Amino acid sequence: MTKGPISNFIETHYKHFNAAALVDAAKGYEAHLTEGGKMMITLAGAMSTAELGKSLAEMIRQGKVDIISCTGANLEEDIMNLVAHSHYKRVPNYRDLSPQDEWDLLENHYNRVTDTCIPEEEAFRRLQKHIYKIWKDAEDNGERYFPHEFMYKILLSGELQQYYEIDPKNSWMLAAAERNLPMVVPGWEDSTMGNIFASYVIKGELKASTMKSGIEYMTWLAKWYPENSGGKGVGFFQIGGGIAGDFPICVVPMLYQDMEMTDIPFWSYFCQISDSTTSYGSYSGAVPNEKITWGKLDIHTPKFIVESDATIVAPLMFAWILGW
């Protein structure tokens, strides 16, 4: 592949320290795919609100990612950006906000993520109106689905097209839905849509069982992993920390130790982008070698860690992999 201007800039200038780690990790990702490997990307933090879809969607379309694990927030916030982008409010001076300023944002139905405020009415409620119908229809038909499957349904139905406010090619969730990309969403309950779903259960309008659970995500992943880990194996590209990464990486030791599948391959590539510093008792800040003791990575697994802001690093790495 002929590399474009962004890749050439990275190759020329990123020679040392975290910059060099970025290049090494990107080249490792590229080599893993070239040798026939598959890749899981995990999304923590507010990557969807950071509009990672501008590069991640193309990664999905070009087959550079085979499965995604993400938080419930990332699952919904990409779609919220798709349907309410013009209503978002940026607050560059967020460090100077007083408690009263924050209260004023709440009174105006804005929920702040660092310098970006998500508009409650246009984002959350607009989506709620349509997703409830899909939840209810499934329940009435005796059907049960995973959280991401419901989101795929609403995107592919075309019902949200009337609200699109960005170029749909920049929505990674739309790209994933169009490819029916495998996905796990651990801890989905900890999200706006999860809270809304719970409210309908409390009101007696929906049954909790209509939504497939986290345990069912793990049992599904326990089937997917052995079917896809032959040859070069499956790599693990972790953006941020938290449950989006901690949950799926455990499928390997679970299969090995609890299912006694002693020939199950370890993850065959590992990279984490995180600004969580190595500290006492922190899983997100742990160095990759610690994962060897948990039966997640092999001694010989290529391991990379880029200790930097993922909103800066991930698009650059994706640009390299895409040849931009």
Roles of regions detected by a PLM:
Residues S55-V65, L82-N93, V201, V252-M261, ...:
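A glycine- and small-aliphatic-rich helix-loop capping segment at beta-alpha/alpha-beta transitions
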Residues I60-L127:
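A generic, well-ordered mixed alpha/beta core segment in the N-terminal half of proteins
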Residues F17-A20, I243, C250, Q257-W324:
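C-terminal functional extensions of proteins
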